[in-house]
Amino acid sequence: RIGGYFFVDHCTGAVIGETAVIGNRVKMYQGVGLVARSLAAGQALRGQKRHPTIEDRVTIYANATIVGGDTVIGAGSTIGANVFLMQSVPPDSLVLMDDLRVKVTTKQERSVAPIDWQI
């Protein structure tokens, strides 16, 4: 299921798995993968949610990969470029790579220690 006002820019290499759910006003850039985890040998696939859920107003930047049917990206979150994510994140989170580790910060944490954005 894909919600309204879904925006894909530079769609080359984007992969949206069969059971992915994408909310309203989601923006996604090139090379993004919404993919499944490997399942145990012989596990039935029919009727199983294997791909992530992306809630409303999420932005996913280039070459990010979000894995797994239990993974939920909370509304209003931003997933940075080149992030490999196998866990859910709360609404209004910012997810970036930090020294080859995924770093998730909530909106509340960022208001305590604001990030100086220069774009």
Predicted regions and their residues:
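Regulatory activation segment
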Residues: 43-51
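PLP-dependent aminotransferase-like
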Residues: 39-40
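Left-handed beta-helix
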Residues: 3-4, 9-18, 23-24, 28-30, ...
